[in-house]
UniProtKB/Swiss-Prot annotation:
Residues 245-256 have a biased composition (Basic and acidic residues). This is Proteasome subunit alpha. Pathway: Protein degradation; proteasomal Pup-dependent pathway. Keywords: Cytoplasm, Proteasome.
């Protein structure tokens, strides 16, 4: 009689974590950061049909990296939850914190109970009436949730991009300054330096000045005007060239 195969819970959790981290690392990066007028989303995304940045509700936005089908299902679920709560109670009762907690419970249950975890990392952002009330929540594949004070970086080159942001970020940046910083940081990821154009970027904001639905995409000429100049890109690239990481592009049809 053969003994049944046994895997310890610790080993099982390690293997699930490794699977999820590898899937996330294959995705192109996303930067979410606070600026003077609200919250800015900048994603490296050449696709014009598959969005990594989306609206959830009036003052709440969503960004994600990893396996598209999995984080898209989370986005749709979040929209439905927010709509039901806003309809049943009041639109002001729909908050980023409540939605982030719901996502954390869902991701944690999948990680511990299902055979395969979600290969995703997501950010839930909420713009407040003032800059002090803006909120950024980072959620990982296992349901861990962190309230970030300034910015969130997700994806395969997160360490390199975070280093660039840490050296240059300051509170109260204007939109053009924040967008230029985020785009330069994304360009610093990968092997050497790259120049990201309008066709490779997905940019949106939660604009505090808008009265109801604050989410607004920035495309075309408006986005082109936010791109950093050659001189700015060159100076930043020269500083970041020594610690550039690997740019893994395999599986980008499934990993975003």
């Amino acid at each position: 009689m053969t003994m049944p195969f046994y895997t310890s819970p610790e080993q099982l959790m390690r293997e699930r974590s490794e699977l999820a981290r590898k899937g996330i690392a294959r995705g192109r990066s996303v930067v979410v950061l606070k600026y003077a007028g609200g919250v800015l989303f900048v994603a490296e995304n050449p696709s014009t049909t598959l969005h990594k940045v989306s609206e959830i509700y009036d003052r709440i936005g969503f960004a994600a990296v990893g396996r598209y089908s999995e984080f898209e299902s989370l986005r749709v679920a979040g929209v439905r939850i927010a709509d039901v709560r806003g309809y049943s109670y009041d639109r002001r009762d729909v908050t980023g914190r409540a939605l982030a907690n719901t996502y954390a419970q869902h991701l944690g249950a999948i990680f511990t109970e299902q055979i395969k975890p979600f290969e995703v990392e997501i950010c839930v952002a909420e713009v407040g009436q003032t800059a002090d009330n803006d909120q950024l929540y980072r959620l990982t594949y296992d349901g861990s949730i962190v309230d970030e004070p300034q910015y969130v970086v997700m994806g395969g080159q997160a360490d390199t991009i975070t280093t660039t942001l840490k050296d240059s970020f300051s509170d109260g940046l204007e939109l053009a300054e924040a967008a230029g910083l985020a785009i330069r940081a994304l360009s610093s990821g990968g092997e050497g330096t790259r120049e990201l154009g309008v066709g490779q970027l997905e940019v949106a904001v939660l604009d505090r000045a808008r009265p109801n639905r604050t989410f607004r995409r920035i495309t075309g000429a408006a986005l082109k005007a936010l791109l950093p100049s050659q001189e700015e890109s060159g100076s930043t690239d020269g500083e970041a060239s020594g610690d550039a990481g690997d740019d893994k592009k395999t599986g980008d049809d499934k990993k975003s």
